[in-house]
Amino acid sequence: KLEVIYNRIHELRMRFEVLWRDADIAHLQRVASGADATASEGERDARQAQLRDDFAFVAQCNVGGEFLADAAVERLHAIGSQTWLRHFDNHLGLASEELKRLLAVAPEAPALPATERLLADRPEHVVPWADDRPPVEKDHPNNRYGFDMVLPAHKQNMGELHNLGIRRGTLTDEDRFKINDHIVQ
């Protein structure tokens, strides 16, 4: 029921919110353990300022304006390497196709809490070609109209770094192929 086409920036924002809260908790734990409150506040404030800056950068990458330089892609990967703790089973509540992809790469739910990367290209983000591979490649036996299209490696790739790292515009190779395939069909 909750599966819709939506902007996943909201999901990413929530992960940043978790890290923000973790910075608050770490500060309170340090102070409760006898650390200098002013120094601890400085650490927390610096961490939270970095989180604000990192999220603003990720959000800007999501808009898909100008060309995304190598340095920007490297920064996305650096930001994405931060971790957070997931306390709920990620197998629960999934639609059948998504659950099938997840079970193919992770038949057993990992022990909880599970450490997750802030931004990730996970195996279950990739939708492989199956029997629905369109007959538009030059040498495909069912290509009756002589199309010569290059199929991307996957039918769809929902990887977060893969999508945020699009160099120009907002379409992945998979998205662009799907549009062109609809045109020729």
Features from the language model and the residues they span:
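Histidine- and acidic-residue-rich, metal-dependent catalytic cores
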Residues: 1-185
